[in-house]
Amino acid sequence: MPTINQLVRKGREKVRKKSKVPALKGAPFRRGVCTVVRTVTPKKPNSALRKVAKVRLTSGYEVTAYIPGEGHNLQEHSVVLIRGGRVKDLPGVRYHIVRGVYDAAGVKDRKKSRSKYGTKKPKEAAKTAAKK
């Protein structure tokens, strides 16, 4: 334990908070280009084929990003928008691709939680809601 005199001379060192999403460089989103699009298997006890993409970002980093939702149209050279947010059962995946922006199309036939998956409001549902 330091003496009062030592604290006066040196002071306490502040604990720096380490970023969970360093590739974003403090920005909320970052644009990037897909280099590889593939499926990976999750950690135990889960079992699936999770869709991920390796993305080269404008910040210079190359990161692995999760592709949310059912089905996607991404391939090599697709331009995508990345946000922070890890996938708990995929080690090393700390970013999500934003659906409905750039080359990542929204999820088809999605009715609920549409804003999270980049899906526009369905036309026929809007008309029937107006009649009732």
Curated annotation (Swiss-Prot):
PTM description: The methythiolated Asp-89 contacts a modifed residue of the 16S rRNA close to the decoding center, and might be important for decoding center assembly.
Keyword Hydrolase set for record: no
The keyword Ribonucleoprotein belongs to this UniProt entry's keyword annotation: yes
Record Gene3D superfamilies: Nucleic acid-binding proteins
Cellular component annotations (GO), alphabetically ordered: small ribosomal subunit
This protein's UniProt keywords: Methylation, Ribonucleoprotein, Ribosomal protein, RNA-binding, rRNA-binding, tRNA-binding
Biological processes annotated in GO: translation
Basic residues bias: start-end ranges: 109-120
Region (Disordered): 106-132
3-methylthioaspartic acid modification, residue list: D89
Entries under CDD domains matching the protein: Ribosomal_S12
GO molecular function list: rRNA binding; structural constituent of ribosome; tRNA binding
Domain of life: Bacteria
Functional description taken from the UniProt entry: With S4 and S5 plays an important role in translational accuracy. Interacts with and stabilizes bases of the 16S rRNA that are involved in tRNA selection in the A site and with the mRNA backbone. Located at the interface of the 30S and 50S subunits, it traverses the body of the 30S subunit contacting proteins on the other side and probably holding the rRNA structure together. The combined cluster of proteins S8, S12 and S17 appears to hold together the shoulder and platform of the 30S subunit.
Subunit structure, as described in the record: Part of the 30S ribosomal subunit. Contacts proteins S8 and S17. Interacts with IF1 in the 30S initiation complex.
The family this protein is said to belong to: Belongs to the universal ribosomal protein uS12 family.
Official protein name in the record: Small ribosomal subunit protein uS12
Species, as recorded: Thermus thermophilus (strain ATCC 27634 / DSM 579 / HB8)
